Amino acid sequence: MSDKAKVTQERILDAAIKVFSHKGYHETKVDDIVEESATSKGAVYFYFPGKQQIFLALIDKFADVLQQRMIAAVTPVNDGVERVNLALQVCLETFAQYRGLAKIFLVQAVGLGAVFETKRLQLHDRFAGVIKSYLDEAIAGGEIEPIDTEVIAYAWMGAINEVVIRWVYTGQPEPERLITPLRAMLLRSVGVPAARIEQLSPTPTITSKDN
């Protein structure tokens, strides 16, 4: 794909984030995305066969951004607990910074039918697997006691999902206020001492975006 084509495709996706996050999936029409992106219907259909494919592409885009950020954050770090901490922190930061995408991923993709549910479950499995891998590393390094990391990873996903969905709907609590107690609760749940949690990288200042 040429650079020009990539720019056009990204413009369409960025426009779709705004339209879907404001109107919802069912109320959004392809014409709305065409208008918001300042492209043409032909251009939109050249890259995406329909509204469903645009929506699924946005879910993939959010998942890719999230995973790339997590990998970039933890790669320079050898400490297992710190890697878990950074992965969790980046996850919450990304949801906060890409609120429109988070709304699409966590809220609107629920209950839209089998295709969307399959995609959503695939991504839950993908990120539960990432969390599990970092917990396994912490166990291998002797930093936490052996636990069933698969079960814990899905429990963590559930906790993160609930607090972020509330934030997406209400804007509360503020991201910085959300991260610190949630991180402490999750890390204590796998046996990380309070004193060790206090030594971890501090919560950064987070700027929320609409897309």
Task: For each feature predicted by the language model, list its residue ranges.
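Amphipathic alpha-helical segments used for helix-helix packing
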Residues: 96-115, 132-133, 165-169, 199-201
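Helix-turn-helix
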Residues: 11, 19-53, 57
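Hydrophobic alpha-helical connector segments
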Residues: 57, 71-100, 152-156, 176-179, ...
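N-terminal intrinsically disordered/low-complexity leader segments
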Residues: 1-7, 147, 196-211
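Amphipathic, non-transmembrane alpha-helical scaffold segments
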Residues: 5, 13, 59, 63, ...
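Generic hydrophobic, amphipathic alpha-helix propensity
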Residues: 8-16, 33, 54, 58-66, ...
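Amphipathic alpha-helical packing segments from all-alpha helical-bundle domains
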Residues: 67, 71, 115-140, 150-154, ...
